[in-house]
Amino acid sequence: MTDHVEPEGGNSSTLATSDLMVTRTGGFNSFSFVDDGATHGEVLLDSGARMQFQDLEAVIPCFTPGTKIATPRGERPVEELRSGDRVITRDNGLQEIAWVGQIQMPGTVLKANPHLKPILIKAGSLGNGLPEKDMLVSPNHRVIVANDRTHLFFDESEVLVASKHLLGTAGVHEVDVIATTYIHFMFERHEVVLSNGAWTESFQPDDFSLKGVGNSQRTEIFELFPELEEKRGVAAYETARRSLREEEAQAMFQP
């Protein structure tokens, strides 16, 4: 059930909860949060209706609208991709998307939770002229980094680094937006895809990221991949590259 709205500032937005997505016009009367290690709370709407939300801390790795993904048909905006579409992957050639999902992030939530704000990776900031165009991603979205230090520190030609762990390096910073949509897509395995000319990850289901999708989207994933309901199934969905911890990423990028 949806009820159309315009949030403060006159910009349309949607608020997603784990079970419900509501789009409405008018301001929010109040926002309340419970700090219990995740972000939980309640939104009181002008109409008097209340909406619960939870696990906003678990913002999953996502692209934002306008990001161009390399496909056999050329670059396509990520928001146009659907299940069954083929995408160019670094390791396994053309692969069909198994599932696509998204999370709406209204300005009210971003203002109350600044750590959820998208991160801008400026063109060229990953080295070797990559990405080719500015790229806006969620804080947990991981990108491929390949340089002399990946060999020196980790004996790896390429590693995955979360965008939030790149903060402080030249050309990477949080941005203030009125609202945004985080879009994610998944394959039969964790893949590396070309986005705005840079190699970045597809969605990888794990205990953390599965909390970040709503109940209905999580059900869709389990219908496609029933093995992911078990810990051993999640463990078998391996990461495409070594993923650096925050301290490892900082060590690699320090002057």
List each model region and its residues.
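Acidic, glycine-rich low-complexity segments
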Residues: M1-P61
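Short linear motifs in intrinsically disordered
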Residues: G26-D36, I60, E75-E79, V109-K111, ...
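A broadly tuned preference for mixed-charge, low-complexity surface segments
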Residues: A49, I60, L130-F154, E230-F253
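A broad, structural micro-motif
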Residues: M51, R76-V78, T180
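Extracellular/lumenal ectodomain signal focusing on beta-strand-rich modules
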Residues: D55-A58, E80, W99, H184
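Long beta-strand-rich cores associated with HINT superfamily self-processing modules
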Residues: T64-R73, I88-Q217
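Structural motif
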Residues: E79-R86
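Non-catalytic peripheral regions of nucleotide-handling enzymes
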Residues: A98, P205-P255
